[in-house]
């Protein structure tokens, strides 16, 4: 057996399916790469010891059925992993959590293997990657240039091919800027779509966990695992049942020439023009828009009372450990003292005005295409002018969470000096899957390698389009490989994903049914394991003809999924469960059938 040279999900899945390698071998190779700091120093704050990593490997099932089975990943060190210190790049502030963050729990449950905790700008405050006592990660293409921040180590770990994907966070652009500087994908989901429980906050009302990946396809696989409502996070939001999509011929907003700011970087300006042409080749029409209200909203993030949220997050540590913080971070957070409650409300009112002003833009376009940053800086430049140059890096990023947008950072080519440039696709909330689908077509049109890896983007699968029909959940004989699945496929139904119901459902094996069928019944107040199911998409006509054939005691109703969304689903009339065997404990119909040897 041998470990694949690249760790993109498509390659790993094929290697596992063929038996060419095992999760243990892949995890050991990821650990070996992580330990080699000669080319990419300062990536890690803590690498997990081999025994801890192998414990995650041993917990995997024998067969590779989980969506992220055996996929190595990294965790930004402001996100909790149970039993491992969370430092937020501030050693004196470190704590050891007893529970993992919700996003980490869900990734591990989906089969992913954590390798370690990555470096960041202290307290996730900065876009440069240079504000850490653990050193400054470098751009993978040139050691004199910054990696971007604050999720610096996570981006480098992916771009260098150490792990398949990595978690970051994003308040002002921390999940996008490092992607641009290292020629990879950075997806910042809709605010609240991924849980922030167990994520140490920068601005709690704005923060988003993010993912760095080699392709939009891989980022989409992580999205499917993490896009779920979390009752333990008061900022969690339920996604709409119908996922928004872009039309075949879409309109995308581009900056007016007079409003383009590249800070003297002519190469970046030229690459932005090329990106506009490239996205137009994917079926889009560029439309110039007024950037003023977006820029005004961006200015509020640091020149406004939202820095008070950063001060709240750090708490008494700010006052009791004056020498325990990076001096620039302390300066930024200390600015909170300038704002009072009146200023906070005034800023909220101004933001509402800016958001109102952007509506004219959203009536004219489906999405925006902006530079991720106007330029890139050498490390010595940032160190000599840390505040102003950091502000320059946020020129096109700081407004995104304030205005409740979803965003996808994708590569956009290289300057003549070999440094990468990136652009960001932005759309209103909950357009995440649509952005990834369009972004993967754009990325494929660009082609080339992802980061420093050998992964060829033009050979990567496209991220799936949002479903355009009626979503239907099936739990038994209509599952893939089961006797009645052809009733779906013959109607052109499209498989969307595997997931579970919310906890409040029971499953029964119905007697005297041919083929054998389960009955799913809602049980309010029941804290069950959730029942495994598949979600399919059917056209309205196909859905109507399908429902017409559903026999009693089966009915089509609505079911709540684990992510809080609601779809149409098979359910069972309660009378049919009288005397039936309850099989809820198996967690799903297939597990129950396997227990019978069927």
Please give the residue ranges for each predicted region.
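Short helix-loop capping/hinge segments that flank enzyme active sites or metal/cofactor-binding pockets
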Residues: 68-90, 247-255, 305-359, 364, ...
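Gly/Ser-rich catalytic/binding loops embedded in alpha/beta enzyme cores
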Residues: 2-171, 277, 282, 488-489
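Gly/Ser-rich, acidic/histidine-flanked active-site/gating loops
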Residues: 5, 70, 82, 208, ...
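A short helix-breaking turn/cap at a secondary-structure junction
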Residues: 188-270, 274, 293, 320, ...
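Compact nucleic-acid interaction/catalytic patches
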Residues: 469, 480-506
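Short glycine/serine-rich loop segments
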Residues: 100-101, 105-226, 401-424
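Acyltransferase
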Residues: 20-28, 58, 264-290, 315-320, ...
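Glycine-rich, small-residue loops and helix-cap segments
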Residues: 19, 70, 109, 163-164, ...
């Amino acid at each position: 057996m041998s470990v694949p040279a690249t760790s993109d999900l498509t390659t790993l899945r094929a290697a596992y399916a063929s038996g060419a390698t095992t999760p243990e071998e892949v995890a050991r190779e990821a650990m070996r790469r992580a330990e080699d700091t000669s080319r990419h120093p300062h990536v890690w704050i803590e690498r997990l010891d081999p025994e801890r990593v192998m414990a995650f490997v041993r917990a995997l099932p024998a067969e590779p059925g989980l969506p992220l089975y055996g996929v190595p990943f990294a965790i930004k060190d402001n996100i909790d992993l149970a039993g491992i210190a969370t430092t937020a790049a501030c050693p004196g502030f470190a704590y050891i959590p007893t529970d993992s963050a919700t996003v980490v729990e869900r990734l591990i449950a989906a089969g992913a293997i954590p390798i370690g905790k990555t470096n960041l700008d202290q307290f996730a405050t900065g876009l440069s990657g240079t504000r850490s006592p653990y050193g400054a990660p470098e751009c993978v293409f040139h050691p004199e240039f910054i990696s971007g921040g604050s999720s610096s180590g996570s981006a480098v770990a992916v771009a260098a091919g150490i792990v398949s994907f990595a978690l970051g966070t994003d308040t002002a652009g921390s999940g996008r800027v490092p992607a641009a500087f290292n020629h990879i994908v950075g997806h910042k989901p809709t605010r609240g779509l991924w849980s922030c429980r167990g994520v140490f906050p920068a601005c709690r009302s704005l923060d988003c966990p993010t993912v760095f990946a080699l392709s939009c396809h891989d980022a989409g696989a992580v999205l499917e695992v993490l896009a779920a409502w979390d009752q333990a996070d008061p900022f969690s939001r339920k996604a709409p049942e119908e996922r928004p999509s872009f039309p075949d011929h879409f309109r995308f907003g581009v900056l007016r020439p007079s409003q383009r700011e590249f800070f003297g970087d002519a190469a970046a300006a030229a690459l932005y023009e090329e990106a506009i042409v490239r996205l137009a080749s994917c079926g889009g029409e560029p439309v110039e828009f007024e950037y003023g209200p977006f820029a005004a909203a961006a200015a509020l993030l640091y020149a406004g009372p939202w820095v008070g949220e950063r001060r709240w997050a750090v708490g008494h540590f700010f006052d009791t450990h004056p020498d325990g913080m990076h001096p620039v971070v302390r300066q930024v957070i200390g600015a909170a003292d300038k704002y009072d409650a009146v200023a906070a409300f005034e800023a909220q009112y101004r933001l509402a005005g800016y958001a109102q002003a952007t509506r004219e833009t959203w009536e004219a376009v489906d999405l925006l295409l902006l530079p991720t940053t106007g330029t890139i800086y050498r490390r010595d430049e940032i160190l000599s002018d840390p505040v102003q140059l950091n502000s320059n890096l946020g020129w096109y990023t700081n407004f995104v969470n304030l205005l409740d947008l979803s965003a996808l950072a994708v590569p956009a080519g290289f300057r003549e000096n070999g440094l990468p440039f990136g652009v960001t696709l932005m759309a209103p909330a909950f357009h995440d899957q649509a952005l990834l689908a369009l972004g993967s077509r754009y990325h494929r049109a660009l082609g080339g390698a992802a980061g420093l890896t050998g992964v060829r983007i033009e050979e990567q699968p496209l991220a799936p389009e949002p479903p355009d029909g009626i979503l239907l959940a099936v739990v038994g004989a209509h599952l893939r490989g089961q006797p009645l699945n052809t009733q779906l496929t013959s109607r052109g139904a499209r498989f969307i994903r595997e997931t579970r119901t919310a906890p409040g459902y029971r499953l029964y094996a119905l007697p005297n049914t041919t083929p054998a069928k389960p009955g799913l019944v809602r049980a309010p107040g029941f804290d069950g394991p959730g029942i495994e199911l598949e979600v399919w998409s059917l056209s309205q006509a196909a859905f109507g003809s399908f429902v017409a054939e559903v026999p009693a005691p089966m009915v089509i109703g609505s079911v709540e999924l684990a992510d809080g969304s609601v779809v149409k689903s098979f359910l069972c009339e309660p009378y049919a469960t009288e005397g039936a065997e309850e099989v809820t404990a198996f967690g799903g119909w297939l597990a129950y059938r396997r227990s019978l040897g069927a």
